[in-house]
Design a protein with these regions (language model features):
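Membrane-interfacial helix-loop-helix connectors in multipass membrane proteins
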Residues: 122-143, 213-239
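Short catalytic/ligand-binding loop motif for oxyanion handling, primarily in non-cytosolic enzymes
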Residues: 202
Length: 347
């Protein structure tokens, strides 16, 4: 809508009764969640949803730095009123798509080495079992240990790095190992919330995929399975996506807010130099913390310990993945893409 119309609408909303404002806010949140639910039903939609999640993470971080309220990003409309009709009504959607493509490619580079190693451990183990290749019996387990070890280290690092990438839009910061580990070390105990939330999401994913094996034996579902198996699968993943998206939003919110508060804490404790921050970080943080560029205190080995000590707590996330594949094998895609880590799509 034109700028004048937008301002008039905002003034009317401010004068509206609190009940009306609360109702419209709830309705808007429901519509946005419904769109996210629809996007999670396909790979292309999941890329768009990933871009939307990144913008949510950005807004959460900015809210921490500015002391403002979190505002969920729009799905379609442009943030500004300039441009033609098409731009004003679709700009956010295209921004989500561009952000999602960049995020998915960057995450693939970061996550696929451990995911491929874990997948190879599974296939190597089964092939060795079928063909009785006892002289290669250790190959599968050793690959599994290596892949899970890499995965646990990755998951200890990823939430902060992902939040930083989402907030700044700079993909290189996803691989800024030293700075990101310094940020992670700012919250050695608060970080325990992350593996708990991710494991809860992993259990949900395992349930959505694994329980599908037993669906034809449940009386309440037999009719739907026999009538139209394809439609049953569509409905199955759609309904499971509701709690999944809720947990996805919670996990990314926690990661973004921990990252944002870690920067403030690091500056206050002189563990991070103001000049090392990205331009976007300095821009938003200037109102929350007026601090000159100081000499940074060295971190060293102690920083690494504070950052990585919860690494073993990520093991249950990978255990749930193996258990789910034992119950209901969904192929290589199930190993390569964990919905809470890469593309937010359950199947």
């Amino acid at each position: 809508m034109p700028q004048g119309s937008r301002e008039a609408y905002d003034r009317r909303m401010q004068r509206a009764p609190r009940v009306v404002r609360a109702f419209l806010s709830a309705l808007t949140a429901i519509v946005r969640f419904a769109i996210a639910l629809i996007m999670a039903q396909s790979v292309v939609g999941a890329i768009v949803l990933l871009g939307y999640v990144y913008r949510r993470m950005q807004n959460h971080a900015i809210a921490v730095w500015t002391g403002g309220r979190f505002q969920a990003p729009k799905w379609l409309f442009a943030l500004e009123s300039d441009g033609g009709f098409f731009h004003r009504h679709t700009a956010s959607l295209w921004l989500h798509l561009r952000t999602g493509v960049a995020a998915s490619l960057s995450l693939a580079v970061l996550t696929l080495p451990s995911a491929v190693t874990i997948a190879l451990s599974w296939y190597t183990g089964w092939n060795n079992s079928f063909y009785k290749g006892y002289e290669y019996a250790l190959v599968g387990p050793l690959l599994g240990v290596l892949g899970i070890g890499l995965g646990m280290l990755l998951m200890t690092y990823l939430p902060y790095a992902q939040a930083r990438h989402a907030t700044t839009g700079e993909w290189r910061l996803l691989f800024s190992w030293r700075q990101n580990l310094q940020l992670i070390s700012m919250h050695p105990f608060a970080n325990l919330a992350l593996p708990i939330i991710y494991f809860a999401t992993g259990l949900l994913v395992a349930g959505a995929r694994g329980l599908l094996t037993f669906a034809p034996q449940w009386r309440a579902l037999q009719g739907a399975v026999e009538a139209d198996p394809g439609q049953f699968l569509t409905n199955w993943y759609f309904y499971w996506s509701v709690p999944f998206i809720l947990l996805l939003f919670v996990a990314k919110r926690v990661g973004a807010r921990l990252y944002a508060s870690a920067i403030i804490k690091g500056l206050q404790n002189r563990r991070i130099a103001h000049g090392e921050l990205h331009d976007a970080e300095r821009y938003y943080i200037r109102g929350a913390l007026a601090i000159a560029d100081t000499t940074k205190l060295s971190g060293g080995f102690a920083t690494l310990i504070r950052a990585l000590w919860p690494v073993l707590l990520w093991l249950p996330l990978f255990a749930a993945l193996y258990i789910q594949q034992f119950i209901h094998f969904i192929g290589a895609w199930g190993w390569l893409n964990h919905p809470i880590v890469w593309l937010p799509v359950l199947f």
